[in-house]
From Swiss-Prot:
Top-level lineage group: Eukaryota
Compositional bias annotation for Basic and acidic residues: 59-70
Protein name as catalogued: Pentatricopeptide repeat-containing protein At4g20740
Keywords from the UniProt entry: Repeat
Polar residues: bias regions: 38-56
Pfam families: PPR (PF01535), PPR_1 (PF12854), PPR_2 (PF13041), PPR_3 (PF13812)
Protein family per UniProt: Belongs to the PPR family. P subfamily.
PPR repeat locations: 157-191, 192-226, 227-261, 262-296, 297-331, 332-366, 367-401, 402-436, 437-471, 506-540, 541-575, 576-606, 612-646, 647-681
SUPFAM superfamilies from the UniProt entry: HCP-like
Stretches the record annotates as Disordered: 1-84
């Protein structure tokens, strides 16, 4: 019997309404999601903006400017917070609670974290794995893993161990991850092959070849035999990281286990043998591959050729090419291109051109890069006509020459004195809306100077200025290029004198010319440029003063060189290594031992990689504390083994060390041994012995004066009429 209906209720049956999920956020009602971090979502108030006509602002496409080698910028990766929030939405509530407990305590394990976790009735292995997959702190992850394992009746499963291994590797603790198999075994869950595979894959992806072999050895100790796939992974990691002998040892184990090679196995070995240059063994492996499995395909042969070309072994790559033809494998464009580029870079442009003609005969699409490499090869061989013919072929094939091809042909034309044609090509490059650089213009500029067409050279400079290129930078690079050839130094000076009248002088150009004249031995002319630079109002920089230091030392004016060194220090700059070497040499010649050692220490303190003789000078000083001639000679022997020349600085270091810590007798023993070995001449021995005596006298006098001042005897000596202290 139906119960009576309550009063005041409509006849229509009640239908309950359930709200599923979060409400839709609006401008006034944000929605808060719980998770790793509070995610307060609200819709911002967007001011209405007039829609612009996108077609009006779109840049028209110009096929002439299109370059197939350019790529669109990759899409920006999602931010870290986005990744974390997305991952937290997939977490179970308990895993989210655990991660929130870590976050509240700033990822520091302690009693507060343990008290939070103890609120949970139980943490299952799946929860442990879920938490460790997002863990970014190895210490907290290890503590949590250990805490979970102490639960009553709890036992980690394979997923938890695997997640722990990934967490340790992700945070750089891969050595600790390698100990997980022992941990699993001690906790009553022996590892399976999968755990070792994970460790091997992690090390292989991070290019840790020796670690891969270490895990492989551990795998054998646990009694596991890898499958073919895992063997391939191990050998590939060892080959890629340069441990080919270990890869061969693993291959021997592979054969002892009675496994059958796959094509991947053969290719790993072949590529390793190619890298090691063991071509005969590689050909034997290829023959076994043909007999036992199948012939290598075009991709396998291309990989071999690419490996050999990258190692610079072109003879072996041609042998592999012959093997490919013997197997009746048709090369593709990648195989042709790899070999042609390698041959041209190795100077075998004729052989590369033969392969190029084969490609044309087979109607294979030829890349512009192949044209460019062939043109550069012909220019390097002096076959400019062939390079120009190839350019015509390039244009007929529908390509537009890039700036690299222009640079190569311009350089070739200038080498055969066709500088006018080269200049026309430069103008064509500008009309084609390319961007010529110094590499384009330098052959033209040098050719005009060599042919003594200085007016045309000036016109080129004006054209450079009109195009908006930095004339001063181009001139600096030009003089560097010209002064690199000693025969063209005189031409460089002639050009400079003309440019100077047109206001194109600069400190950098003066420095280049000063250094060139110094290397030629024309010290006076180099210094005259230095004085001229100052007279014209240019402020010398540290390089200018460094070159002047070298010049003054060669001239014999060490005092002036020292004054320039002080100016460099006042500028808060560092002299060049050449200036340090030159100044120490000059100070050695006038017997300023302390100043030499001071400069040695200053140089090694200021310069990133100082001269080896300076480093050994400090070593000699340190060894002299033992006052043992044999120890000093051991350092000298080490210098000879390292190929370091024993010069004045080392002699000064011996004098400085022995005058402070040793005796004159021990120093003479060292000099006598150096003379016996014909390292030091008899005249040098006499000079340095005198320096040794003088330096010892100085140090003895310094000790006496220090003692007088320490005991307060100065006033008594002056009262008795002693005037030595005044001097």
């Amino acid at each position: 019997m139906k119960s009576p209906k309550p009063p005041n209720l409509s006849d229509k049956s009640l239908k309950p309404n359930f709200f599923h999920g979060h409400r839709k956020p609006s401008q006034n009602r944000p929605t808060v999601y719980g998770g790793l971090f509070s995610n307060r979502q609200s819709i911002p108030r967007v001011s209405p903006q007039p829609q612009s006509n996108s077609l009006a602002h779109r840049t028209p496409f110009d096929l002439r400017k299109w370059d197939p080698e350019t790529h669109l910028p990759p899409p920006s990766p999602p931010s870290h917070s986005t990744v974390i929030s997305a991952a937290s939405e997939r977490l179970s509530p308990i895993a989210r609670f655990v991660l929130d407990a870590f976050r509240k305590n700033r990822n520091h394990w302690g009693p507060s974290v343990v008290s939070e976790l103890n609120k949970l009735r139980r943490v299952t292995p799946s929860i442990v794995a879920e938490v460790l997959k997002l863990g970014n702190d190895a210490a907290v992850a290890a503590k949590f893993f250990h805490w979970a394992g102490k639960q009553k009746g709890y036992k980690h499963d394979f997923a938890a161990y695997n997640a722990f291994a990934y967490c340790l590797n992700r945070n750089g603790h891969f050595r600790a991850a390698d100990q997980l198999p022992e941990l699993m075994d001690s906790q009553g869950r022996p590892p399976s092959e999968k755990q070792f595979e994970i460790l091997i894959r992690m090390h292989a992806d991070n290019r840790r070849g020796l670690r891969v072999y270490y895990v492989y050895e551990k795998m054998k100790k646990f009694g596991f035999k890898p499958r073919v796939f895992l063997y391939n992974r191990i050998m590939d990691a060892l080959v890629k990281n340069g441990y080919f002998d270990l890869a061969l040892a693993v291959y021997e184990d592979f054969k002892e286990d009675g496994l059958v090679e796959e094509s991947t196995t053969f290719m790993i070995l072949v590529k390793g043998l190619c890298k090691a240059g063991r071509i005969e063994e590689m050909l034997e492996i290829l023959q076994r591959m043909r007999e036992n499995l199948c012939k290598p395909d075009v991709f396998a042969y291309t990989a071999m050729i690419k490996t050999l070309v990258s190692e610079g072994n072109l003879d072996a790559s041609l042998r592999v090419w012959d093997e490919m033809r013997r197997d009746e494998i048709k090369p593709d464009v990648m195989a042709y291109g790899t070999l042609v580029v390698g041959l041209c870079k190795d100077g075998r442009v004729e052989r590369g051109y033969e392969l190029f003609m084969e490609m044309k005969g087979k109607q294979i699409l030829i890349d512009r890069e192949i044209y460019r490499v062939l043109i550069e090869g012909f220019v390097a061989d002096g076959k400019v006509r062939s390079a120009c013919n190839l350019w015509e072929d390039l244009v007929d094939s529908g390509y537009i020459a890039d700036i690299g091809i222009y640079n190569a042909v311009i350089k070739g034309l200038c080498s055969v004195n066709q500088v006018d044609k080269a200049y026309k090509l430069f103008q064509v490059a500008i009309e084609e809306e390319l961007e010529p650089d110094f590499e384009t213009l330098s052959p033209i500029m040098v050719a005009y100077v060599v042919m003594n067409r200085l007016s045309d050279f000036s016109n080129v400079l004006e054209r450079i200025g009109e195009l908006g290129y930095p004339v001063s930078d181009y001139l600096t690079q030009f003089f560097k290029l010209l002064c690199a050839d000693e025969e063209k130094n005189a031409m460089a000076l002639d050009v400079f004198y003309i440019l100077k009248t047109k206001g194109h002088g600069s400190v950098s150009v003066y420095n280049i010319l000063m250094e060139a004249l110094y290397k030629m031995g024309d010290i006076q002319k180099s210094l005259s440029l230095f004085y001229e630079m100052r007279k014209l109002g240019f402020e010398p920089d540290s390089s200018s003063y460094s070159i002047a230091i070298c010049c003054f030392v060669e001239k014999g004016d060490v005092k002036a060189a020292c004054s320039f060194h002080e100016k460099i220090i006042e500028m808060s700059c560092v002299p060049s290594i050449a200036a340090y070497l030159s100044l120490t040499k000059g100070l050695c010649q006038i017997g300023e031992i302390d100043a030499v050692m001071l400069l040695v220490r200053e140089c090694l303190g200021n310069v990133e990689s100082g001269p080896m003789e300076f480093k050994y000078a400090l070593t000699v000083c340190h060894v002299c504390k033992g006052s043992n001639a044999e120890k000093v000679m051991k350092v000298v022997d080490e210098m000879n083994q390292e190929g370091v020349f024993i010069n004045e600085v080392i002699y000064c270091a011996i004098i400085s060390g022995m005058s402070k810590h040793g005796t004159i007798k021990v120093a003479r023993e060292v000099f006598t041994e150096l003379k016996k070995r014909k390292v030091m001449t008899e005249a040098d021995m006499v000079v340095y012995e005198e320096m040794l005596i003088e330096q010892t006298k100085k140090k003895t006098a310094d000790l006496v004066l220090s003692g007088i001042k320490f005991f307060g005897l100065e006033s008594k000596l002056r009262a008795k009429g002693c005037r030595l202290l005044d001097n």
